[in-house]
């Protein structure tokens, strides 16, 4: 009886595919495309040395203590990037694989990229379904830091107030991120004479719009901040494995979704491991725990996006 063996399926997968998936995830995920990537992790936990105390300089008074110089110190705290595993399983009918008239990867690859990018953004920005040893999502962290500005309906003024929050923490805003509905608001942003405000500082800042369905418009209209202060590291690049004898269960209730051998199916399991953190070191403008490199525009009770 003719069957599709694992080696037969492996021949459909080129080595470069894993790299293409990884590059696609980085491109499609706003977190991975906007945050700063650190060198790959060598274990499941990476320690970050974070500046916690700044040195203090003194003028020397020759009339006091024979001009003796004062001493000072610096201090470092530590934070950790914890690697979490992200995986997806794509079941495929063997008959589909036998259809030479279609490009299997052209159908499967975009869905894998989409699933990974969406899960990463949900966890990193909003803390939705995040691993237990990951920090809070970016928006919940902004709320905890008291770095929210209430929306007034005057977008230009609102963005200015959000940027001021970041600047008072000692950081410079290098990007603004929001949902796709924010595009229309930017197009309507004009001065008192009705002219577009594209030549101002706010108009020149990089704008990004999340279009993967993750953005929660009821929690935040937009985020502004220094996105280089959010960092991530990869523990394991995208890897794949072909399954042909497995049983796939529903994680929510344990019910069997597919019995690959019985259902004449194979499944592609794709895995990557990564972690992230916001070091938030002290700086000359703000040495207190109130500082945070991001701020959010809190939507009105009836969001307009």
Can you annotate each of these PLM segments?
Residues 1-39, 259-305:
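Protruding loop/beta-arch "assembly-hinge" segments enriched in small, turn-prone residues
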Residues 2-88:
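Assembly/oligomerization interface modules of large self-assembling protein complexes
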Residues 16-31, 104-108, 112-116, 120, ...:
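Short, Φ-rich (hydrophobic/aromatic) sequence segments
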Residues 42, 144-266, 272, 301-305:
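Extended oligomerization regions of viral-like shell subunits
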Residues 49-52, 93, 179-181, 210, ...:
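Structured loops at beta-to-helix junctions and adjacent beta-edge loops in soluble globular domains
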Residues 54-56, 87, 96, 118, ...:
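Short loop/turn segments at secondary-structure transitions that flank enzyme active sites
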Residues 59-61, 102, 187-191, 218-222, ...:
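Short conserved micro-motifs at the rims of enzyme active sites and ligand-binding pockets
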Residues 77-80, 87-168, 296-305:
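Alpha-helical scaffold segments that mediate packing/assembly in large oligomeric complexes
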């Amino acid at each position: 009886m003719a069957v599709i063996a694992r080696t037969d399926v492996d021949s459909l997968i080129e080595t470069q595919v894993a790299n293409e998936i990884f590059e696609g995830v980085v491109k499609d995920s706003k977190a991975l495309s906007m945050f700063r990537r650190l060198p790959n992790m060598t274990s499941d936990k990476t320690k970050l040395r974070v500046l916690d105390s700044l040195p203090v300089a003194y003028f020397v008074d020759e009339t006091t203590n024979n001009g003796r110089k004062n001493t000072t110190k610096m201090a470092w705290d530590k934070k950790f990037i914890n690697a979490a595993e992200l995986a997806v399983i794509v079941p495929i009918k063997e008959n589909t694989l036998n259809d030479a008239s279609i490009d299997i990867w052209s159908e499967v690859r975009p869905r894998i990229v989409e699933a990974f990018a969406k899960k990463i953004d949900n966890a990193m920005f909003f803390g939705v379904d995040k691993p237990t040893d990951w920090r809070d999502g970016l928006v919940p962290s902004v709320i905890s830091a008291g770095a929210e500005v209430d929306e007034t309906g005057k977008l230009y003024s609102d963005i200015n107030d959000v940027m001021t929050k970041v600047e008072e923490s000692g950081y410079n805003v290098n990007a603004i991120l929001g949902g796709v509905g924010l595009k229309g608001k930017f197009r309507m942003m004009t001065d008192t004479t009705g002219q577009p405000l594209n030549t101002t500082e706010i108009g020149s800042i990089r704008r990004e719009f999340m279009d993967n369905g993750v953005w929660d418009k009821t929690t935040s209209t937009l985020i502004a901040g220094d996105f280089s202060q959010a960092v991530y590291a990869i523990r394991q690049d995208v890897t794949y494995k072909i399954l042909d004898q497995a049983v796939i269960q529903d994680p929510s209730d344990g019910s069997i979704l597919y019995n690959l051998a019985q259902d004449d199916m194979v499944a592609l399991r794709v895995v990557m491991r990564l972690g992230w953190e916001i070091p938030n070191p002290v700086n000359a403008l703000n040495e207190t725990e109130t500082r945070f490199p991001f701020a959010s525009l809190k939507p009105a009770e009836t969001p307009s996006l």
